[in-house]
UniProtKB/Swiss-Prot annotation:
Gene3D superfamilies: P-loop containing nucleotide triphosphate hydrolases. It comes from Paracoccidioides lutzii (strain ATCC MYA-826 / Pb01). Residues 18-30 have a biased composition (Basic residues). It is found in: Nucleus, Nucleolus. This is U3 small nucleolar RNA-associated protein 25. Keywords: Nucleus, Ribonucleoprotein, Ribosome biogenesis, rRNA processing. GO terms for cellular component: nucleolus; small-subunit processome. GO terms for biological process: maturation of SSU-rRNA from tricistronic rRNA transcript (SSU-rRNA, 5.8S rRNA, LSU-rRNA). Residues 113-127 have a biased composition (Basic and acidic residues). Component of the ribosomal small subunit (SSU) processome composed of at least 40 protein subunits and snoRNA U3. GO terms for molecular function: rRNA binding; U3 snoRNA binding. It comes from the Eukaryota. The keyword Nucleus applies.
């Protein structure tokens, strides 16, 4: 069953705070459906007898082309239409090849572009309505790693790979090829028993670094020296020149983290900003491209060895179960466009198949009415903000192919929801997530934005990474690496997570899903505190009230009791003067959790304690008309109280007028929201002084430590969490 996009599993499926401006955006009038067809085993047997190429097979079959045929499996959008167009071309080639005789395999022919011009190739389908539909999956012959070179003579393969000889100091060789099985087992045993040893240090920009390694005998954690530029990295020649042109200079922070990224260690980076996001995007794109090319290079060299020594007993293990090696999880289609722009400027292919279709369905212009919106809002929601998408990407020697089928892809880019729609079949059909079995690099960018969609989808995807496949998918098991066969791939996979801030959910991902034997690091900022950056002309009193909570499970109940017995009682008294005469209104109650919002809304509507209290409510599921009505009634004073959720602010960034005092049922996850919401007090200049006197009151417990650190600052947090010394703290 496909879960909804809200943070609560029972919430409406299609609602996501009202967002969804993207072109087409996968929201067609047709109900999403999946199709699957299984090719009979006899077909596979016949194909093998006819010389069909599997993973690791010789690359001399004339009928193998770069583009997958109609029997290839799990696809991204539009691949079915593309295959229908390519089939006549395949048939023509087969007819032309029949006259070459059977005296042995013919030398592969390849069109040579002597002018070396870049060409964008468009493969049009017959039904454009499928362009943004669902992945149409079929089971058939799978693509081998290195298949893109099958139509290229081996002397050309050697020419392309010249100058990229194996280097024992290359992190790729150390992590994937020259693996000591005994040491690997020791590290996995330590990780399984949570035996990590850690070392803390400082990074440039007031960041704190915690480096962790599996606790094995005689191992000492070493802080890696900074890398001053990409020239010092072990890059493929095809990438080195363009990397130098586009990533010419690294700042001190990026230089400190590059050795860990390119050293295949896991990274949780909790200081993503608008200023550094492009740099780290370019770096991780360079890293995954380097990984894809080196993986292909190793497969091709080993294929060449097997061709030269067909009767030898060489054991060359250089592959996984399936071809996809990189998974990049992103929040929106426009974020996917930015990643593709980084990839294409670093890997400058002569041809880009379906590029125009990609930009037509993934990119859009910014909304001109958003000029007053904050910069972080425009970065996240600018352009095509649809959050249901997936894209397969295939690389050949001269071509980048968009919308390649998943089992023929090198990189998969997707949103958590878009990927889950593929993994979870409707109508009782068989689930399919084998294409995630051989992921060696997983990247989560803008993880904080994914939290506001439905983090459960992200957790679901990670729970299905590197599982043993249910079907062979044309795999040559004699070429599969041992740690894949031993179900140890998750301990070799590198995971890179980039977020503007770190939450308990992201920390849980770091603890439970990032189990790399190469080690892992966490980079977190030292916060000055959002309370110091309030956009008001006069000082405002900011009060924090701590309540006791024995466990995270009991925290919602303890918070509700404290609110109704202490905060709400005081609030109701302040609304009524002598003789029951109503006094000033204008109280905004900010609520981070939708579930808490529903509970408080129902309590205010039914409790005798609040029978004389008028209130309005705005959540991420409130219609535009009801939002306008609630805001109008609150501004006019007809409603004394307005309930307002954090996800509403995330998706809309409303400017609420008429606010004279603010109660934070809980502090926001995003520290930017603190200043924006407190700034509501100054939207009416005439009443700014009165509003500043009303001030802000926020509730917190010790389980809110991560959020509170961002709001009050790292140095102030310790005293505020102590059990002794009072439970109320005020700042002006």
């Amino acid at each position: 069953m496909a879960a909804g996009r809200g943070r609560g599993g029972s919430r409406p499926f299609s609602v996501r705070g009202g967002r969804g401006r993207g072109q087409k955006g996968g929201r067609g009038s047709r109900r999403p459906t999946f199709e699957a067809s299984r090719v009979a085993e006899a077909h596979h047997e016949d194909s093998s007898e006819d010389g069909s190429v599997h993973l690791g097979s010789d690359l001399d079959a004339e009928d193998q082309l770069e583009a997958p045929d109609e029997s290839s499996s799990s696809s991204s959008d539009d691949e079915e239409d593309e295959n229908r167009t390519e089939k006549p071309y395949n048939t023509l080639l087969q007819l032309l090849n029949t006259g070459q005789g059977v005296g042995g395999p013919a030398r592969k022919r390849r069109k040579m572009d002597h002018n070396s011009k870049k060409v964008d190739v468009e493969v049009k389908g017959s039904d454009e309505s499928d362009a943004e539909g669902l992945l149409l999956e079929s089971e058939g012959e799978e693509s081998s790693e290195g298949e893109e070179m099958e139509d290229m003579p081996m002397d050309e393969v050697r020419t392309e790979n010249s100058g990229d000889e194996n280097d024992a100091s290359d992190p790729f060789e150390i992590h994937f090829s020259n693996v000591d099985s005994t040491l690997l087992s020791q590290k996995i045993k330590a990780i399984s028993s949570k035996g990590w040893q850690s070392h803390k240090s400082e990074l440039p920009g007031k960041l704190r670094l915690m480096a962790s390694q599996p606790n094995t005998e005689g191992h000492i954690i070493q802080v890696l020296p900074a890398t001053q530029g990409v020239d010092n990295l072990k890059l493929k020649q095809k990438l080195a020149k363009h990397a130098g042109d586009h990533i010419s200079k690294l700042d001190s922070l990026a230089s400190s983290l590059v050795p860990y990224i390119f050293g295949y260690q896991d990274l949780l980076f909790g200081a993503r900003t608008l200023s550094n996001s492009a740099t780290f995007r370019d770096l991780y794109c360079l890293h995954v491209l380097n990984h894809i090319l080196k993986t292909r290079d190793r497969v091709l060299k080993n294929n060449s060895r097997l061709q030269k020594e067909p009767e030898s007993d060489l054991e060359l293990r250089d592959q996984g179960f399936t071809r996809p090696k990189v998974l990049i999880i992103l929040p929106t289609r426009q974020a996917c466009v930015r990643v593709m722009e980084s990839i294409t400027k670093l890997y400058q292919a002569e041809q880009q198949e379906n590029k125009a279709r990609f930009y037509e369905t993934f990119s859009a212009a910014d909304d001109k009415s958003w000029e007053h919106k904050p910069d972080d809002f425009r970065e996240l929601f600018g352009g095509n903000d649809d959050d249901m998408f997936r894209l397969g990407l295939k690389f050949t020697r001269k071509t980048i192919k968009y919308f390649s089928q998943f089992y023929n892809s090198d990189i998969i880019l997707a949103s958590p929801l878009g990927l889950r729609m593929v993994m979870d079949k409707e109508d009782g059909e068989k689930q399919d997530f084998d294409f995630l079995s051989s992921i060696e690099i997983a990247i989560v960018d803008q993880a904080d934005a994914l939290l506001m969609q439905n983090w459960e989808h992200t957790e679901y995807v990670f729970s299905h990474l590197n599982l043993q496949p249910k079907e062979s998918h044309g795999c040559d098991f004699s070429r599969v690496r041992n740690w894949y066969l031993d179900d140890q791939a998750k301990y070799v996979r590198q995971t890179l997570t980039f977020s503007s801030f770190i939450t308990p959910e992201i920390n849980a991902l770091f603890s439970s899903r990032m189990q790399n034997t190469a080690g892992k690091i966490k980079a977190t900022p030292t916060y000055e505190g959002a309370i110091l950056d309030i956009p008001l002309p006069v000082p405002v009193k900011q009060t924090f009230s701590r309540f006791n909570s024995s466990s995270p499970v009991k925290d919602p109940e303890n918070r509700f009791k404290y609110f109704t017995s202490t905060v709400l009682s005081s609030l109701i008294r302040s609304f009524t003067g002598r003789g029951g005469t109503p006094r000033a209104s204008g109280t905004l109650i900010f609520i981070p959790s939708y579930l808490d919002f529903v509970r408080i809304r129902n309590y205010l509507a039914t409790s005798s304690q609040t029978e004389h209290l008028s209130f309005g409510a705005i959540s991420e599921y409130t219609s535009v008309r009801d939002v306008a009505r609630a805001r109008t009634h609150f501004f006019s004073g007809r409603h004394s109280v307005l309930l307002y959720t954090e996800r509403t602010h995330h998706f809309r960034r409303y400017q609420i007028r008429g606010v004279k005092r603010i109660i934070m049922y809980g502090v926001p996850e995003n520290p930017v929201f603190w200043g924006e919401v407190v700034g509501f007090l100054g939207l009416d200049p005439a009443g700014a002084a009165e509003a500043a006197e009303g001030g802000v009151r926020a509730l917190f417990s010790k389980w809110d430590a991560l959020k509170m650190e961002r709001i009050v600052g790292t140095k102030r947090l310790g005293n505020m969490l102590m059990e002794k010394g009072g439970d109320t703290f005020s700042f002006v």
